[in-house]
Amino acid sequence: MKNLAVFGTASDVGKSVIATALCRIFSNEGIDVAPFKAQNMSNNSGVTPDGFEIGRAQVVQAEAARVVPTADMNPVLLKPNTDTGAQVVLQGKAVANRSARDYFGNTRPWAEAAFESLRRLQAAHDMLVIEGAGSCAEMNLYDRDFVNFKTAEAADAPVILVADIDRGGVFAQVIGTVSVLPPEAKARISGVLVNRFRGDISLFEDGVRFLEEHSGIPVLGVVPFFRGFSIDSEDAVPLQTIVDPSGSPDPGKISIAVIYFPHISNFTDFAVLEREEGVELHYLHHAKALDGYQAVILPGSKNVRGDIEWLRQQGWESRLEDFRRNGGVIAGICGGYQMLGRSIADPYGVEGVPGRTAGLDLLPVETVLQQEKTLCNARGVMSGNGYSVHGYEIHMGETSCHGDALPLFDVTTRNGIAVSARDGVMTSDTKVFGTYFHGVFDAPLFRHWFFRQLSASYTPSERTEDRDEDYNRLARHVAAHLDLDKLYRIIEK
């Protein structure tokens, strides 16, 4: 078993994307490779074909590796639902809510489960690409950190250290990280990868020499900043995303606003909208007049009742009511769907203190949060026009309709099993709708229907979505700037 670990000098340095590229590079070489991340902290999750919840990044990496995603690829998933707490998903199933103090007070049970999953993956595949978490040198948590060097040790994996030059301070990132690590951890780092370089790489040759001389570790590559692929991000809305942009929406484009909740989840639902020609997508946190926007989307949330109270405090409720009266389209996905209804009840304290919170009353539905989470990949058709739709469901709520509304989707399969069910509702004028389907905008016919609600002159672009080619494009880009011969020698050593 030959493994490779990809660690970072900090969060958001590009570990997930580099790991994704390596999964595809190794798969293209005919290697049976799979991704692994012992613990992920993210509200951006996905559902495996057998109905387990893992981080979205590991779903993407499994696709790049051409293997079926499983719960073992991300055995511990922390989904923040307050500023200091999170829901713990263990090997694909939600098991508890924990404060940060409680969780980190004793990580041994979580580590044992993670290493159990690691052993199963090692038995099932020839190679693992192991992604670390955050900075691999958080010394205040080092003795409790089982995601980075303890996992690398358990898998006997050499480590590539990824640093982000785009944010500045790359020398301090690398040399500082290496200098604080204990000798046995430093000895496991076999190479450095400088990520997101802009400009003429030849001008960084002195920088490479400086890094190698002062860290004692070879630089395996300098990867230029690259926008030529569309791959889901891991944790939160990417740092380069502008929230509350200045200026007004472009009158020459279809303009869509996504409300940026404090506990926003599954923001990758909207990546496909951003890539559409003639469409602009803005994330809005602070309440503002919605003039110039054709649609507003309420995304998923890991704390629906808390986020709807925040929405009211920010002044969004009256803005949305005005937008509705003026004929704007309002959509809700998962938690956003629940918010559009009349009420959200939490009798079991799933998201915190038990209670009931009034919704926005834009759809005649009511939601009750349950103790068991619904996890499935689903397919169906739009009610009325038969357009094919697909998505994945991750929710604690059960939502029922108590008034005059049209069904949105007829669900035909869940996790590959035939069903006869309905999901979502919309108003009779089709201006307000909600669904539990994450990823539904990835369904072309539904996406085109949505755009036609916003602009009668909309015509679909000729660009086709090809995720597999995106992975190949990413792999080619990284491989072109990485010393693969040296990397393979490190792995085989």
From Swiss-Prot:
Protein name (database record): Cobyric acid synthase
Gene3D superfamilies named among the record's database cross-references: 3.40.50.880, P-loop containing nucleotide triphosphate hydrolases
CDD domains: CobQ_N (cd05389), GATase1_CobQ (cd01750)
Keywords annotated in UniProt: Cobalamin biosynthesis, Glutamine amidotransferase
Pfam families: CbiA, GATase_3
Family that this chain belongs to: Belongs to the CobB/CobQ family. CobQ subfamily.
NCBIfam families assigned: cobQ (TIGR00313), PRK00784.1 (NF001989)
GATase cobBQ-type domain ranges (all copies): 253-446
Source taxonomy: Bacteria, Pseudomonadati, Chlorobiota, Chlorobiia, Chlorobiales
Keyword Transmembrane helix belongs to the record: no
Superkingdom of the organism of origin: Bacteria
Function comment: Catalyzes amidations at positions B, D, E, and G on adenosylcobyrinic A,C-diamide. NH(2) groups are provided by glutamine, and one molecule of ATP is hydrogenolyzed for each amidation.
Protein's pathway: Cofactor biosynthesis; adenosylcobalamin biosynthesis
Segments traversing the membrane: none
Active site: 334 (nucleophile), 438
BP GO terms, sorted: cobalamin biosynthetic process
InterPro entries according to UniProt: Class_I_gatase-like (IPR029062), CobQ/CobB/MinD/ParA_Nub-bd_dom (IPR002586), CobQ_GATase1 (IPR033949), CobQ_N (IPR047045), CobQ_synth (IPR004459), GATase_3 (IPR011698), P-loop_NTPase (IPR027417)
Gene Ontology MF annotations: ABC-type vitamin B12 transporter activity; catalytic activity
